[in-house]
Amino acid sequence: MSSLRQTLFLACLLSLPALAQQPTRPPITGIAFARFYTTDATAAQKFYGSTLGFERKEADDMWLYPVNHSQWIEVLITPAPPQPNVRMAAVAFTTNDADKLERYLEAHNITPDIPLKDGQFGVRDPEGNLVIFVQQNSVKPVATALASPSAASTRMIHVGFIVTDRAKEDAFWQQILGFRPYWHGGPKDDGVINWASLQVPDGTDWLEYMLNAGPSPNLHQTGVMDHFSLGVSHMNDAVTALAHNHCEGPNCTKTQMGRDGKVQLNLFDPDQTRVEFMEFAPAQEPCCSPFTGKHPTPGDQNN
């Protein structure tokens, strides 16, 4: 063997332990929760508890509203949110190995903003959004919660927030975490993309980039964009459930066809955060781009 070949062979051997030590990403299976601030506790309870029909739990000075045994909404009560025109505090995703995922992100030079404790840790994405990863079934008030008979939906299917630099966000969400393109589009047929959806690597839930928000969105504009979505098989069932829960106002029955071909209905909590009811599957062909992933179903939440 020539000296050059020997050198290359030895270099390969020496590199094998380092490669073997690189942690791999464990599965990220879906949305765990979305967390929002509210400035009106009574009105928030009426909206999330009475109108949407979720039973309230309390933990760590927060209100938890289980959607199912592995997904929930978190509400933080404060008279003065950190940013006056922003109510979203965090989004969270489920993994079956939070410890391994934390080490994986550290290996990619992403230092936890909130170190792993009680099955959860948090990091900041490139635009400063708090992203929490939750060990499967680690939140007992949710994992043991009974289904609410008055819930208008039992499935969270996506979360969305304002994104200003799509390339930077893609480097984190796609290249490091492995999220996959699902659909993108805009309000007009002019090629401008206002919404870009990325599915979790190991499930059907998705994150929606809300693009082109402008330099200074007001509270309502931010609330439209920083949102979460509840899935339903048939929108009429959601309308019926909302009526049973004494939903007030014209939005309670105002269904519309989304540009992605899915029927939707939008409500707003007391702090202008949008809750988007959406059918699991499209009722017609989407605009702008085809879907590139499997659609969610009622029973495929994080198990």
Placement of each model-derived feature along the sequence:
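Residues within well-ordered alpha-helical secondary structure of globular protein domains
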Residues: 13, 50, 104-107, 175-176, ...
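Core segments of cupin and vicinal oxygen chelate
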Residues: 26, 32-73, 119-122, 160-207, ...
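Bacterial N-terminal signal peptides
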Residues: 7-17
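Short loop/beta submotifs within extracellular cysteine-rich repeat domains
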Residues: 46, 55-56, 71-74, 81-83, ...
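Positively charged n-region of N-terminal signal peptides that target proteins for export
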Residues: 1-6
